[in-house]
Every structure is written in C-alpha cells, then in structure tokens.
C-alpha cells in the first residue's frame, strides 16, 4: 500500500492512500481515520488495519491525483532524520578522493549523523540553493526507512516487523560547508535540503528484507548514480538493531541509509548543482522524486 500527504481542494492537508498506479487518492479522513499527520497515523496502520482499508477503498470514489497538491509524505518529521554516511563502498572511494580530511572513509562501524528537517521538500518542490552561503551544492539519492512502531533493544534478524515502509530521500549537501566545519550536520540541514517522497510504500510490498532495489539519480536527464540498495555496507537490519541498543527509536523515525557512488563531488572535475538544475531520484518499486534547484 502507498501513503502520501496531500493538500485537498479545500486547502486541508491530509494523509491519504495512493493507488498503485499513482492516479487516485483516498484521504484517510474519508475512511473514518482522523489523524492530523501521517506520522500520527503510522503506529495505527497495522497490516490488519491496512487490509481493512484495502477493502474499504474498493467501494469509495477516489479523488484524481490532479485534484490534490502533493506534499512530502512526512512534511515535518517529529525528530531529526537519522542518516548513514559512507555506506556504499564505491561512494567511500570517491568521498576520500574529494576530501580525506572531511570524509572518514576507513571505518569498521557504521557512521551515523543527523539531519535537521524543518519542512521536507515534496516531489515537484524546490531545492534551495542558498547561493549566499553555498558554492558547492550536491545531491545524494537514498533509500529511507520509516519505522512503524517503537524499537528498543531489537536483536538483528528481528527488525523486519518494525519497518512501516520505504521512501526516497535526497540528502542534499553543501560540500564546502561540510569541509569547512569538519562535520556534516550544518551542511546537510539548511532549509530546502531534504526532498522526501513521492510516497511511502509499505514494507509488505517487497518480498526481500532488506530489499535489494535498483537506485538511480539523474541531473538534467544525465544518469549520475546507478546502483542497488543490496550493496550497502551496513544493511537495514543491522542499522535498526544497532541503533535500538540503548536508544528508543520512535514510530515514524526516518532513517536515510546512505548514497551510492556518482555524486557531484566524486566527478573529475567535480560538478555541483546550480539554480535551474533538475534532480531525479529513482528507486524501483517506490517511484521517482523530482526537484528543481532554485
């Protein structure tokens, strides 16, 4: 099942179900579920509830997608996004080539950092260039995991039931800010730096766990990234199990699982984003997240 957040014709922002073909929308409020945000609804959208919703929407007229304004599925995350750095081997190599001082690529343990998201950028929304502050703007196409229930001290091999679903996240990054500060938080947390979407696809739509999905990124139609989430160094099962040891991961937590090779800083010479560039992040089985830099 696919979930979105959208603005209805009357201006109300509502979580909703999206049809598999992306053409029809059923607001949850039409189905008797009164939740202000999808984050609020997620803990209650169990497999049993979703099965009932599937039956219910079969008899209810839908809104056409053109009648609503698509927002990010989780427009304002309750907590910072948890991110993994250097989680594909080929990206590790290009990051070290760009700046071994700023990117610690030799590691035996996962690298975690957080990303502040005041308001997530929806599919079709704008990446803010911040040209007064940023001269080296970069993209990072990533698979993001959304937790469906609180996780604490979950053993590896038992994390699957804690995953609500998956979405696409573009971890937009200011490389010059990163290298200047020798850390990643500030350079990844500027307003307009976190496109998320276009929807959340529930975990039961994918047979494998962790899923092994083709992941690609295009800039102005040119393929820049082309990999598979199965090539992650630390997979989703490992990450949830490790992070939940001594730390409670709340339902609705978003974990961005790292980007593959092909980012702008890894090119020779580096090629960074400028206003007017269009970035498309694509993960098979989820969709395409398209944003323009301004």
Identify what each model region corresponds to.
Residues 1-106, 110, 280:
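N-terminal non-catalytic cap/leader segment that marks the start of a structured domain
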Residues 4, 71-73, 100-103, 128-137, ...:
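A generic local secondary-structure boundary/capping motif
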Residues 7, 83-84, 114, 138-148, ...:
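Short beta-strand segments
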Residues 8-10, 18-24, 147-149, 203, ...:
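Short acidic-glycine loop/turn motifs at beta-strand connectors
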Residues 13, 49-50, 61-63, 68-69, ...:
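Catalytic-pocket segment enriched in acidic/His residues
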Residues 100-121, 139, 274-285:
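Structural signature of FAD isoalloxazine-binding scaffolds in flavoprotein oxidoreductases
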Residues 121-159, 164, 169-173:
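Non-heme Fe(II) oxygenase catalytic core, chiefly the N-lobe of the double-stranded beta-helix
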């Amino acid at each position: 099942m696919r979930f979105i957040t959208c603005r209805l014709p009357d201006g109300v922002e509502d979580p909703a179900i999206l049809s598999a073909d992306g053409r029809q929308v059923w607001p949850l409020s039409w189905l008797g579920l009164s939740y202000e945000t999808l984050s609020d609804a997620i803990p209650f959208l169990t497999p049993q509830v979703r099965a009932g919703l599937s039956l219910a929407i079969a008899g209810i007229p839908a809104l056409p997608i053109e009648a609503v304004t698509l927002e990010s599925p989780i427009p304002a995350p309750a907590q910072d996004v948890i991110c993994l750095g250097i989680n594909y081997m080929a990206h590790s190599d290009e990051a070290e080539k760009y700046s071994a001082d700023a990117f610690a690529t030799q590691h035996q343990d996962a690298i975690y950092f957080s990303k502040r998201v005041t308001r997530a950028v929806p599919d079709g929304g704008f990446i803010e260039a911040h040209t007064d502050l940023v001269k080296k703007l970069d993209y990072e196409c990533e698979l993001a995991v959304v937790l469906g229930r609180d996780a604490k001290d979950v053993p590896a091999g038992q994390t699957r039931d804690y995953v609500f679903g998956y979405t696409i996240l573009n971890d937009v990054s200011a490389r010059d800010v990163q290298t200047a500060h020798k850390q990643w938080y500030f350079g990844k947390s500027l307003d307009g730096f976190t496109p998320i979407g276009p929807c959340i696809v529930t975990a039961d739509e994918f047979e494998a766990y962790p899923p092994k999905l083709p992941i690609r990124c295009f800039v102005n139609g040119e393929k820049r990234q082309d990999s598979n989430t199965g090539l992650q160094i630390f997979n989703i099962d490992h990450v949830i199990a490790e992070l939940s040891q001594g730390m409670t991961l709340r339902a609705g937590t978003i974990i961005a699982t790292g980007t593959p090779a092909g980012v702008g800083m890894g090119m020779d010479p580096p090629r960074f984003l400028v206003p007017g560039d269009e970035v498309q992040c694509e993960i098979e089985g989820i969709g395409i997240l398209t944003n323009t830099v301004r």
